[in-house]
Design a protein with these regions (language model features):
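Single, function-defining residue in the core of a domain
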Residues: 1-225
Length: 225
């Protein structure tokens, strides 16, 4: 049932106000540990500290977590990861490189997965029929990751809605998931998809907690400090 049991890490985030182009430039030049996204790596470390050592732990993240340093630090903390990819990463293939998209195009579907997709504005509720592909890949560290591992061996699970499942005027559902878990068969791939879908429940839990539990969003402060 994937029922949430509690919080292993929780923090209130006060985002610094930075205007326009300065925000983009500043974010690009900051060391990873000074970036806002580093909070996800801290969450992994805090979770490891409060969960029994004999329990296998997995951080599930959305596209915001598609950061090489995050994947590296999560593994070092003793956690696995499952994240939705946002970058068309270059992957090592023999003595050359190919993009993740190029590799997936060559891969034939290895099975199908169906689930009920709830409706929302601009999208009808339906049973989505997804084609499933999976494969091991090797991603290399960006130049900004000085001092870390040169490469990471991970698995990619790709799910894309079949054309005959998509209503007219709507885009197909498509996820590219990267994980440190071994994925060598359809059962393992579907397990990763199920874990990723748990994000919907987790996000709803946080939304209710913020709005109905702690009413954080109703608090108006003169100063964020």
């Amino acid at each position: 049932s994937y029922l949430p049991l509690g919080f292993s890490s929780l923090r209130i985030w006060n985002r610094e106000r930075v205007e326009g182009r300065k925000k983009t430039n500043r974010r690009a030049t900051l060391p990873y540990k000074d970036k806002e996204s580093y909070r996800w790596a801290l969450a992994a470390k805090e979770s490891v500290a409060c969960i029994p050592s004999d329990v296998r732990k997995t951080i599930v993240g959305d596209r915001e977590n598609d950061i090489y340093a995050f994947m590296e630090e999560t593994l070092e903390a003793g956690c696995d990861f499952l994240i939705r990819s946002s970058h068309n990463r270059k992957c090592a293939v023999d003595d050359d490189f190919e993009t993740l998209t190029e590799l997936l195009i060559k891969r034939k579907p290895m099975g199908e997965y169906r689930f009920s997709l709830p409706g929302r504005k601009g999208r009808k509720n339906r049973t989505a029929i997804m084609e499933v592909r999976f494969m091991p890949i090797t991603i290399h560290a960006p130049h900004s990751n000085a001092g870390g591992k040169e490469k990471l061996d991970v698995y990619c699970v790709h799910v894309k809605e079949r054309a005959d499942s998509v209503p007219a005027s709507e885009e197909p559902i498509e996820w590219r998931l990267l994980t440190s878990h071994e994925v060598t068969n359809l059962t393992q791939a579907v397990q990763c998809i199920e874990w990723y879908k748990c994000r919907w429940l987790i996000e709803e839990l946080f939304r209710v907690t913020k709005s109905k539990g702690f009413t954080i969003e109703n608090v108006q402060l003169e100063d964020g400090e």
